[in-house]
A protein has these predicted regions:
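Terminal targeting/leader modules
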Residues: 19, 31, 140-142
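N-terminal secretory signal peptides
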Residues: 24-86
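Bacterial N-terminal signal peptides that target proteins for export
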Residues: 1-9
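Extracytosolic low-complexity repeat regions of secreted or lipid-anchored proteins
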Residues: 100-121
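C-terminal segment of classical bacterial N-terminal signal peptides
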Residues: 14-22
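Mid-chain, structured segments of secreted extracytoplasmic proteins
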Residues: 73-106
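C-terminal partner/receptor-binding element of secreted or periplasmic proteins
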Residues: 114-142
Length: 142
């Protein structure tokens, strides 16, 4: 009897992640829908990517985004048959750790992560697009 009980308990414990996965996925979908330009997850991703860019491309080891202000959405392209990715175009003013203010433009793309789960964030800080990836003055993201 104790072996049967332990086997059942172990089976239930191993199946628990499988049962909770849809619930977690539901939470992720709700979270993803709630993401807007000022969502903390989006801003954290931008800040992290900017630190890497500042260190690796501009050789500014301590430069970071210190604060965001005037966050706004200026365009939203919803997902359609002819446009499979929903995109939210945003802008903001940032204060860098050296005290300088800059304009930042960014896009949040929905459903472009692994297996179409997750979002992608691309950004351009005015004056920091050394290779003109987003054209002069971050034009592509404006």
């Amino acid at each position: 009897m104790p072996r049967t009980f332990l086997a059942c308990l172990l089976s239930a414990a191993l199946a628990l992640p499988l049962v909770s996965a849809p619930a977690q996925a539901g939470w992720l979908w709700k979270e993803r829908e709630a993401r807007e330009c000022g969502h903390p997850h989006v801003l954290k991703r931008i800040s992290s990517k900017f630190r890497t860019q500042a260190r690796e491309v501009h050789h500014e080891k301590t430069l970071a985004i210190a604060d965001y202000g005037d966050i706004h959405e200026h365009r939203y392209l919803e997902k359609r048959d002819d446009r499979p990715i929903a995109r939210r175009y945003c802008g903001a003013e940032v204060t860098l750790s050296d005290g300088r203010g800059r304009t930042i433009w960014y896009v949040v793309e929905r459903g472009v992560g692994f297996a179409s789960v997750g979002d992608n964030v691309e950004f351009c800080v005015s004056g920091f697009d050394r290779w003109n990836v987003y054209d002069n003055g971050c034009r592509i993201l404006r």
